[in-house]
């Protein structure tokens, strides 16, 4: 879509406002709204100035001016605002050069795609992420000098089997780890997910399926079609926006936290990906599970750099409460056909055109632009340096005896470990100027602040364990 088409949309839809959206370092969407009459052809060349110092990890107050540059191809009508509003996604540019800001996640993703093409290895990378989420009825939390607390409730929660409700308790709720695929009334979110699908498609996503996920208390997934990398990251931001707002309409609250509840499965964001050149899938071949040698090298790069990638793909302290054995979380850095206990799976496909790999350790707290870019850069490093991943692991990795398990590398065990690994293993990200040292340092500093706060805050379980010592 061109700027001319956007100007036509403004008239055809009697648009009153234009909502300029961008994504901060942590992955949260931000926005500023302007009257539609402010938008003309020059607007798409000059953009809009804003204060970058107010965004965590970005500019200092002494050099705060930045440019929101609208990407006309992303224009879509907002389905939630009362007044007709057009959403346009923006890149963050430096005002002096009008080049992509080195810490802008969307600009980083676009540079990664440019770098891919510059290598001559491929011209297209496709991503098919699968973010999971929870829908709750009530969430209360807080932390202060006098104490910390969190309380979750949902009509589907297995703990509510004996709860007294006005009108009676109707039962029909999924057990712990028992939520996968039951029909209503056990699956109480059918209509909510259907509405999410309709709104997502209204906003340009292609929905392939939706279903209840494994965990009790409202874990769900909506599956959408793959796309090129930056476009798919844009779609993940739309996906989250729709999930949050449709949930709100239904009187629910949605979360993409990786592990909101102890004792049941957490939420992942498995990432399917493949490379192609001139329309030919480069991951299809005659090696293991129908993969090409390039695909194996790509896997080798992801495994080699996995702990550094964890800092971007699993970016919260909560992420590492999911990445533990026993809850279908992929902690072993191995690859396998069909085997979901491996961190990298090769799905069964009906045609070589669909041949791909699935990296299973990312979670939906990740900034999609940074997560996808890091995975791509690791894979390209694997191809360039012919990093073979070793033999596939087709046995159930969850059941390995300890002496075998210790021979297989694992993902980072904590955010602190992941950030340390990113600090040490960053050169693959800097190839082609995709990530800069300044961007990586700022990201690490931002996440260390969170890690320090969690580490220094007394936890209720500590009182259970140690109060009476």
Curated annotation (Swiss-Prot):
Pfam families: Gln-synt_C, Gln-synt_N. Catalyzes the ATP-dependent biosynthesis of glutamine from glutamate and ammonia. L-glutamate binds at residues 265-266, 322, 328, 340, 360. ATP binds at residues 208, 272-274, 340, 345, 353. The keyword Ligase applies. Residues 13-97 form the GS beta-grasp domain. The activity of this enzyme could be controlled by adenylation under conditions of abundant glutamine. The modification O-AMP-tyrosine is found at residue 398. It comes from Escherichia coli (strain K12). GO terms for cellular component: cytoplasm; cytosol; membrane. It catalyses: L-glutamate + NH4(+) + ATP = L-glutamine + ADP + phosphate + H(+). This is Glutamine synthetase. The lineage of its organism: Bacteria, Pseudomonadati, Pseudomonadota, Gammaproteobacteria, Enterobacterales.
